[in-house]
A protein has these predicted regions:
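Oxyanion-hole/transition-state-stabilizing segment in secreted/luminal serine hydrolases
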Residues: 1
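His/acidic metal-ligating clusters that form di-metal
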Residues: 4-82, 119
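Binuclear metal-dependent phosphoesterase catalytic core
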Residues: 55, 77-127
Length: 127
């Protein structure tokens, strides 16, 4: 499925080597989400997400994983790591609607504020 992302083995090794040497709180940014969203949106997430999560969960320093691609706002925590995706600027989807049905009025972006040990994510709606 061309809509699904895959991290190749060489890149996964590079990520692993980098993650294992972290000494500071870290934000990881991906294109495809590394967590299940639900419904038809799960066809658009990172295919080898379990291996990716296994690597980043090894580090005590990864605080959050940001992603896009699905044009839907999500914000969840799994095993101590926060995962968040952004809505789309031009159009937004919802895992609760039919495949590729546009969710009118959900367009927007995320405003991320980092203060010491806090990461605040505010979804900003376009109206």
């Amino acid at each position: 499925n061309r809509s699904r992302g895959v991290i190749d083995i060489d890149t996964m090794i590079k990520i692993k080597n980098k993650i294992y040497t972290l000494k500071k709180p870290t934000i990881v940014v991906l294109h495809h989400p590394a967590l299940e969203i639900g419904g038809w949106q799960d066809l658009k997430i990172l295919k080898n997400r379990d291996k990716f999560r296994e690597i980043i969960e090894y580090s005590e320093y990864v605080r959050i994983v940001l992603a896009g691609h699905i044009h839907e706002f999500t914000d969840r925590t799994l095993n101590g790591i926060r995962y968040s995706t952004a809505p789309g600027l031009g159009f937004a989807f919802s895992s609760k609607l039919s495949n590729y049905e546009i969710q009118h009025g959900a367009e927007g972006f995320n405003l991320i504020t980092i203060n010491k040990n806090k990461i605040l994510i505010n979804k900003i709606a376009l109206k």
